[in-house]
Amino acid sequence: MGGPHAKAYMGWWGSIGSPAQKGITTYTVSPYAQKPLNNIFHNAVFNTFRRVKSQILYMALPAALYWAWWVNCRDYNAYLYTKAGREELERVNV
């Protein structure tokens, strides 16, 4: 354990003169990691379209239901405050 012992020192790390290394794995950097901004604008357009397309029903259906409810309530309220709806307003406004 620890540092080199007497007559066992073979030089600094990577120095010529050391015995051949076994089991050394070398790694390289992926070309995609070397160019992180490659095609950024092209991918932004098509990726945004793909993501919006996959989520549109989760936004459009509740929005359509809310809009239909809002229009119905607005029209019903306008009807209640007309001469024709006065009787129903009295009945609803208990």
From Swiss-Prot:
It comes from Kluyveromyces lactis (strain ATCC 8585 / CBS 2359 / DSM 70799 / NBRC 1267 / NRRL Y-1140 / WM37) (Yeast). One of its GO terms (cellular component) is mitochondrial inner membrane. Keywords: Electron transport, Membrane, Mitochondrion, Mitochondrion inner membrane, Respiratory chain, Transmembrane, Transmembrane helix, Transport. Residues 1-49 are mitochondrial matrix. Component of the ubiquinol-cytochrome c oxidoreductase (cytochrome b-c1 complex, complex III, CIII), a multisubunit enzyme composed of 3 respiratory subunits cytochrome b, cytochrome c1 and Rieske protein, 2 core protein subunits, and additional low-molecular weight protein subunits. The complex exists as an obligatory dimer and forms supercomplexes (SCs) in the inner mitochondrial membrane with cytochrome c oxidase (complex IV, CIV). It is found in: Mitochondrion inner membrane. Pfam families: UcrQ. The chain crosses the membrane at residues 50-80. GO terms for biological process: mitochondrial electron transport, ubiquinol to cytochrome c. Residues 81-94 are mitochondrial intermembrane. Component of the ubiquinol-cytochrome c oxidoreductase, a multisubunit transmembrane complex that is part of the mitochondrial electron transport chain which drives oxidative phosphorylation. It is a single-pass membrane protein. This is Cytochrome b-c1 complex subunit 8. Belongs to the UQCRQ/QCR8 family. It comes from the Eukaryota. The gene is QCR8.
